[in-house]
Amino acid sequence: MVLTDLNDNVVEPEFLSVDWELNSAGKNGYPFYMEKEIMEQPEAIKNTIKDRIVNGLPDFTSDGVPDSLFTDCDRICVVACGTAMHAGLVAQALVKSIVHVQMDVELASEFMYSDPVIDEKTLVIAVSQSGETIDTLEALKYAKRQGAKCLSVINVKGSSIARESDYVLYTAAGPEIAVASTKAYTTQLSVFYLVVAKMALLRGVYTEEQTKSFIAELERVPEVMQKVLEKRRDIHVIAKKILEAKDLFMIGRGLDYSILLEGSLKLKEVSYIHSEAYASGELKHGPIALITTNTPVVATVTQEKLMSKELSNIKEVKSRGADIVLFIKEALSGDLDTEYQVIKLPDMQDEFMVLPASVALQLLAYYVSSDKGFDVDKPRNPVSYTHLRAHETDQYL
């Protein structure tokens, strides 16, 4: 057999080793891949971070990523789509609050059309599970032409985005078969936590001891995530109560809002319930008009500094007749309205609570979809985002 390129030139095949077992692509007794992949997240995160922690500190030596990549940039720009973009929003909040470096998150599909301010002092981070998301790939190529350094966070080795990038940080999620991404999202987050710790240390924001403390909390994530998975029956009970909802709203502040955008996407993607996530403070600017008797509202409260404001917003929608589903950090769950449906999330430092909370939201979406009798792994109207229409990008090639 002879391989040729599009110009009929003979090319040598490039062989890549796949670092997962064949049986990891099976359902292993689960009814759907999505449930299996949700349950695999503690191990996936452990595998993603373990070789990047040396003596308690973040280390990207094995990835070939130099420290200068994180010190020589004036600003960071994440380009991504869908779930990967939501991972970037969490990273943005952490980088700005901890490292105090400007970080923007751009929808890859809009990036090239917005005349972005990109130069050689910009670090562009492309995020994609498959590494073949065409909008993200084209955004990355555009950024490189502007002189930016490009790092990608990818799950599939040898993918197009990985080959186009200057540097790559691979996640160890393994094969993700379900259309709705779960473990790719949380492993992307775990990589971003390592990047935040590395930047904070290199830029003198954190001492070595502070960095070790941050990393030690990251290493707790698989254990804490497992505790959330053990609450799945409680989450299933709540899911049964929103099966017939036509509309559902999610509200939160700060990091909670970032993960609710992803939670809302998951719910609408697999259950076909119209779901919208709002920053809680924006409710009074119009969305509260949509809240009527028995409207389900999902809220998360994991950030202590924002708790009082968030609980006030929850009371406001409750007074309009909403049915409240509350995911709350256990340490913050003192006196709550007994009419709320509450899931208490195991405690972590506030900046890490997005990880256990994300799993709870994934389970909620999964159970709503499966109980409605849908094929959870294959939502309707599937679209492949890896196919390129030439007329859409010719002007940028």
Label every PLM stretch briefly:
Residues A87-G88, D104-V105, I134-L137, H236-I238, ...:
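Extended hydrophobic-aromatic, low-complexity segments
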Residues T71-R220, R253, T300-P346, L364, ...:
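Glycine-rich phosphate-binding loops that contact phosphosugars or nucleotide phosphates
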